[in-house]
């Protein structure tokens, strides 16, 4: 079956290249990014550590299917809590980020620099629409110093909201998210359980642009096996190229790294050899283990097939952050966020982290000349037709722009598998 799929991909490739009669323009030169300051580099490392601990906490939640979080944005949310909190409320936020030994000004300046660097979509040649807004009850007034500092470091907006009219309040939140993401994320949530505290909302749309694009004609409808007995139809895009690749035969998994345009970041995909729950792979996944796997990767010819489309995911991170140690800020009776409002009358009721993540064919022109090379005649097959884990990694700092898993893409049921 896989051999037939590989043959099909090459037939598509041959037809696509035949139609591409013009010699493509040279690919864009690799981008440049300013070197991070020592404090920002330290926080890049800490945010990468946070990525794995948060992912593991979320993966254990049986109610969660697809996972999609931006660790650097979560780190900024913790920085915001630290900025607006006092005493244990503030120190817990720094502790979750493993930044207890850093001075407050180092944390805020470092996180601000890191966020600006990683979300610079022009330098990275990716599409990343990002907005953060702190909603407070209508009875709360945000302190001027907090508003100014949170805008400076975290580009966070502030707004009062009246939940006596919950329908109107939800509409306001969702309209802001849609506007922030140019309509790519039309809805953050359908409901808010706790309406007597502050709501921190992150709304994002991210679309990577490949260092070498997929040909737009190499797209077709295929099956994605959610489980061995449940398959949904999705659009799949295909290409063959030279990529960093490693096949861990002992642990029965593959890993491939696909550079994004300007080569300042890359998409890394980890996938078990066969259809299975991701629990086994997730138990292996740590910051250290990822480094080991990447150290074993070699440049190889790989025929890649990926789902094409948009994944929309909203998480309320409140309970997951609480599990990592952020217990006071979310407790109405214990929270001290008095630097936010000047009064000890506020707690963090929800942390909505909403993202639309699009995989498409767009990218730099590919070099047609490589397809005559001998090494591309027998490529490794990376056919992402079952659940996998993925990361978007900054090549300079090792910080993670995103970490997630795709378990159930959008699509209609196709058939039952034996």
Swiss-Prot record:
What does the entry say induces or represses the expression of this protein? By heat shock.
- Molecular-function annotations in GO: collagen binding; RNA binding; serine-type endopeptidase inhibitor activity; unfolded protein binding
Q: Where is this motif: Prevents secretion from ER?
A: 415-418
Q: Which residues carry this modification: N6-succinyllysine?
A: 94, 296
Q: Which InterPro entries match?
A: Serpin_CS, Serpin_dom, Serpin_fam, Serpin_H1_serpin_dom, Serpin_sf, Serpin_sf_1, Serpin_sf_2
Which top-rank group of organisms is this from? Eukaryota
Q: Does the keyword Endoplasmic reticulum apply?
A: yes
User: Would the keyword ATP-binding be found if you checked this record's keyword annotation?
Assistant: no
Give the N6-acetyllysine positions (modified residues). 207, 319
Family label? Belongs to the serpin family.
Which clinical disorder is mentioned? Answer: Osteogenesis imperfecta 10: A form of osteogenesis imperfecta, a disorder of bone formation characterized by low bone mass, bone fragility and susceptibility to fractures after minimal trauma. Disease severity ranges from very mild forms without fractures to intrauterine fractures and perinatal lethality. Extraskeletal manifestations, which affect a variable number of patients, are dentinogenesis imperfecta, hearing loss, and blue sclerae.
What's the protein here called?
Serpin H1
Q: Which organism is it from?
A: Homo sapiens
């Amino acid at each position: 079956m896989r051999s037939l799929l590989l043959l099909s991909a090459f037939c598509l490739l041959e037809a696509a290249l035949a139609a591409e009669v013009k010699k493509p323009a040279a690919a864009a030169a690799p981008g440049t990014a300013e070197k991070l300051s020592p404090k920002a580099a330290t926080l890049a490392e800490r945010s990468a550590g946070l990525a794995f601990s948060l992912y593991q906490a979320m993966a254990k939640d049986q109610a969660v299917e697809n996972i999609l979080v931006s660790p650097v944005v979560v780190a900024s949310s913790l920085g915001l809590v630290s900025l607006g909190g006092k005493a244990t409320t503030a120190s817990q936020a720094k502790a979750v980020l493993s930044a207890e030994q850093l001075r407050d000004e180092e944390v805020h300046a470092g996180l601000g620099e890191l966020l600006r660097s990683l979300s610079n979509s022009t330098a990275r040649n990716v599409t990343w629409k990002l907005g953060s807004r702190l909603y407070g009850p209508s009875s709360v007034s945000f302190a001027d110093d907090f508003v100014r500092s949170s805008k400076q470091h975290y580009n966070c907006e502030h707004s009062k909201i009246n939940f006596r009219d919950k329908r109107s309040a939800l509409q306001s939140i969702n309209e802001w998210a849609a506007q922030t993401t140019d309509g790519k994320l039309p809805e953050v949530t359908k409901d808010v359980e706790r309406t007597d505290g502050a709501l921190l909302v992150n709304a994002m749309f991210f679309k990577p642009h490949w260092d070498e694009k997929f040909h737009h004609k190499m797209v077709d409808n295929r099956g994605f096996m959610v489980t061995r007995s449940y398959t949904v139809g999705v659009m799949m895009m295909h290409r063959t190229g030279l990529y960093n690749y490693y096949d861990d035969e002992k642990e029965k998994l593959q890993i491939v790294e696909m550079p994004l345009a300007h080569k300042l970041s890359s998409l890394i995909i980890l996938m078990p050899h066969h259809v299975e729950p991701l629990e086994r792979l997730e138990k292996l996944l740590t910051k250290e283990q990822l480094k080991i796997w990447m150290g074993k990767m070699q440049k190889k010819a790989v025929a890649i097939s990926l789902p094409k489309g948009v994944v929309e995911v909203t998480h309320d991170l409140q309970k997951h952050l609480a599990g990592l140690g952020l217990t006071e800020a979310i407790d109405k009776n214990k929270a001290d966020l008095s630097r936010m409002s000047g009064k000890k009358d506020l707690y963090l009721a929800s942390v909505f982290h909403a993202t639309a993540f699009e995989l498409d064919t767009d990218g730099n022109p590919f070099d047609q000349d490589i397809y005559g090379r001998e090494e591309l005649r027998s490529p490794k097959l990376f056919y992402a037709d079952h659940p996998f884990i993925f990361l978007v990694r900054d090549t300079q700092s090792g910080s993670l722009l995103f970490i997630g898993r795709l378990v159930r893409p959008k699509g209609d049921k196709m058939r039952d598998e034996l």
